[in-house]
Amino acid sequence: MEKPLDKLFDKFLQGQAIFRDRNALRPTYVPDELPYRDEQMNRIGAILGPTLRGAPPSNILCYGKTGTGKTVVARYVLQLLIEKAKQSGVVAPLTAFVNCRIVGTNYRVLRQLCEDIDARMPDGSEVPFTGLPTDEIRSIFMRKLDSGPNIMVVVLDEVDSLVKRDVSQGNDILYGLTRMNGELINSRVSLIGISNDLKFKEMLDPRVLSTLGEEEVIFAPYNAVELKGILQQRVDIAFNKPAISDEGVINLVGALAAQEHGDARRALDLLRTSGELAERRGDEKVTQGHVREAQKIIERDTITEAVKTLPLQSKAVLFSVYALANRGKKDIFTGECYNVYSEIAKALSLDTLTQRRVSDLISELDMLGLINTTVISKGRYGRTKKIRLAVGKKQIGIILDEDVRLSKVAKDLL
């Protein structure tokens, strides 16, 4: 007797598979060769090289827009460094990768570091996800690290999100990490901060900046030719040969990603989604039509993810723009946006931010592509921002409705 999904699953068993290794198109994949990033690799390698002699390297800040290769270069250089240490019979550095957008509190950062070096509680159990004083979990980590002459390199990916979420707490987390070396006896910690925001430094406490930003490495966006080269390299690894025989597919993906400030991550995501669309439909080849459709899917998913991961204060500001747009306002100005935001903040029992801080959050929402702003001069009355939603009201409304707290407020405001 045929079962409900037999025919669907049979499609995946028949014919030539589209993918050979789809993981080659994911952000965490580290290829054997990294094209177009020799300068940055050499720079980071030269800074980290002293670890092979048992000397702690300087802290590094890597800057560049999303998809410019910052994270993959850091992973690649550390991977080669560890391999070289093992080949040479010297102690390899310990490494940890912390995604600061996900691991956003001091406790969770320290807990992940404990996990990475297998630092445990006095009774041998794992450090719990919650419940310990931060000082205690810090002591557990430092005691384990200092049990030998260790050098640990901690990569803080999207480090700017720590400070954007909460300036004071973010600076405290970074300061706590940078001052560890003053308390350790046998070991040392070095940090690699990775930021998508070139203005990130302006938000740092001077005492953090002076220590964290000892060395800076800039990653410029990839151009169209470089994106095409990266795509071709990954196509050869990820797809079976007949799957992408139309060169126009790679050219189109590269051109679309070049419009997105040379975002290689976006290009690889677009290529993977195109392949998955072809696979689900039982098509043997990836076409430009698949690419166009994949682009629409990714844009929709990107907006959803961007809104869902916003801090609550930023959601409140976005909601105020949405509420005014929903009332039929085409051009929304900072002052009226602030008035509605104040109502929302009060209803959510949030601290009401100053108008200047709300203006900063409006700029951040503009940078994320959720709203469009234009600065307008009002003569002797100064300047203001004209604001419009950059995405459909319906889509924003559906996402905001999924937030339980905001959906309750919406009933009173809309």
Residues covered by each model-derived region:
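A short, basic N-terminal segment
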Residues: M1-S58, E83
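Mid-core helix/loop region of P-loop NTP-binding domains shared across ATPases and GTPases
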Residues: E2-A17, P57, A92, I102-Q112, ...
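Walker A/P-loop nucleotide-binding motif
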Residues: A55-L80
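Conserved catalytic segments around the Walker B and adjacent sensor/switch elements
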Residues: N59-L61, K84-I102
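Short, hydrophobic-biased segments on the C-terminal half of alpha helices
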Residues: L78, L174, S359-S363
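Post-Walker A helix-loop "phosphate-sensing" segment adjacent to the P-loop in P-loop NTPases
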Residues: Q79-V91, A119-P122
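C-terminal helical "lid" subdomain and adjoining coupling/linker elements of P-loop NTPases
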Residues: V167, F239-I244, L252-Q313, R327-F333, ...
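Terminal-proximal interaction/regulatory segments of ATP-powered molecular machines
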Residues: L324-L414
